[in-house]
Regions:
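N-terminal module detector in large eukaryotic regulators
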Residues: 99, 222-225
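Structural signature of tandem-repeat unit edges
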Residues: 2-22, 29, 33-49, 57-70, ...
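N-terminal regions of proteins, emphasizing targeting and processing segments when present
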Residues: 173-176, 196-199, 222
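Short secondary-structure boundary/capping segments
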Residues: 22-23, 224
Length: 236
């Protein structure tokens, strides 16, 4: 659908509809495709879901409605140009791969599911889990309220140079640092007892995984690291 310039629907269609040339589900709850030429767009009230790849053009501003609940994977991943995206209080579901790499994310304070830290980290509302991160930062500092770095939390954070993991963290999920290709070194605190499969897969420059505590205390090494066990330094 990325190369479409116009969409025409049968006048009898009961599944889809066009509003100002843009494609929606017939009930208006799913935003399917932005076909406009303007770089500034407001998704209308009533929309509850942004469908995968609904906007694949360069934009300047995008305003999301107060009715929005779900931002599907890849929805805005190809939408470059928006420096800061405000996530409404109504949103309950979104993914790290929903957004373009250069877009900062800011969650409305009234959101009951998520909260943002410095427009970079997205945590659960309680602040105990890192859910995802904006991918345009070079330095990431995880607050000491966090106990878990979730699966794919730092997916494709290719600009990451350094990350600070506090002693409060006990779990690092599968693929947590997938394709953090600029990261050269990471220190795992003694509090961490579990690292998921492929946590460091495709981290091509990661040559030092420094783990505090006794050797081999965390199973599954080297967790997809390109340099294998040579990259792991126990008991640092």
């Amino acid at each position: 659908m990325n190369k479409l310039s116009t969409i025409e629907l049968s006048s009898t269609s009961k599944n889809l509809k066009l509003v100002d040339g843009n494609l929606y589900s017939y009930d208006g709850k799913r935003f399917i495709k932005y076909m406009g030429s303007s770089k500034n767009f407001t998704v209308p009230e009533g929309v509850e879901t942004l469908v995968s790849r609904c906007i694949t053009k360069s934009m300047t501003t995008l305003n999301l409605p107060s009715t929005l609940k779900v931002i599907e994977g890849w929805s805005l991943e190809s939408m470059s140009g928006v420096n800061l995206l405000n996530i409404p209080a109504s949103v309950t579901t979104m993914y790290t791969y929903s957004f373009h790499a250069n877009t900062k994310l800011r969650v409305a304070e009234g959101n009951a599911t998520y909260k943002s830290i410095d427009d970079v980290l997205i945590l659960n509302k309680a602040g105990t889990k890192v859910i995802m991160a904006s991918r345009n930062a070079t330095t990431y500092n995880i607050p000491n309220t966090v106990t878990e770095i979730e699966k794919n939390a730092f997916y494709y954070c290719t600009k990451m140079i350094s990350i600070t993991i506090p002693d409060s963290v006990t779990t690092i999920g599968a693929g947590a640092f997938y394709s953090c290709s600029s990261l050269k070194e990471i220190t795992i605190p003694q509090s961490v007892t579990s690292i998921g499969a492929d946590a460091f897969l495709h981290c091509g420059n990661l040559t030092a995984i420094n783990i505090k505590g006794t050797a081999n205390r965390i199973s599954g090494a080297p967790w997809g690291a390109q340099y294998g066990n040579r990259a792991i330094n126990w008991n640092v």
